[in-house]
Amino acid sequence: MDRLKPQSAVSGLPLATALMLDIFDEPIVFHRAYVPIAGGITAALFLSHAGYACADLPEDRGGWFTRTQNEWERDTGLTRREQETARRQLRERGLLEERRVGMPAVLWYRVNWARLRDSLERQSRSHWAGRLDE
């Protein structure tokens, strides 16, 4: 029966405090419009976060940024396999570019913003055709 008793503390924190910290942790947000374009929710989440990750890059980087697998998992909750699948889907659609640089190789990413915009425009025209006065 002891297994069923609620724990009174986690790492020195009262359980209610630890629970509240988890509940009010930063939410993971993605653009809903990316789901059909990216190939699913996982790829849409990856693409949304990639856009967020490169938002404040210096211009001399040309849009390229780097993230480790652990950083992606920490920031998005996606496992290694989910990341690999999302990356493949995005590469196949021309929405994400990748390159390996250095020794040991570091994986760099770049969102293809022109392709994303074209995809969003096509999707919007199709979705809203005949519903908006233009």
Predicted regions and their residues:
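Winged helix-turn-helix DNA-binding recognition segment
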Residues: 54-110
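Short alpha-helical interface patches
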Residues: 32-37, 95, 113-121
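Short recognition helix of helix-turn-helix/winged-helix DNA-binding domains
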Residues: 1-71, 104
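Charged low-complexity intrinsically disordered patches
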Residues: 1-19, 113-134
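Intrinsic disorder/low-complexity segments enriched in polar/small residues
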Residues: 6-8, 27, 70, 85, ...
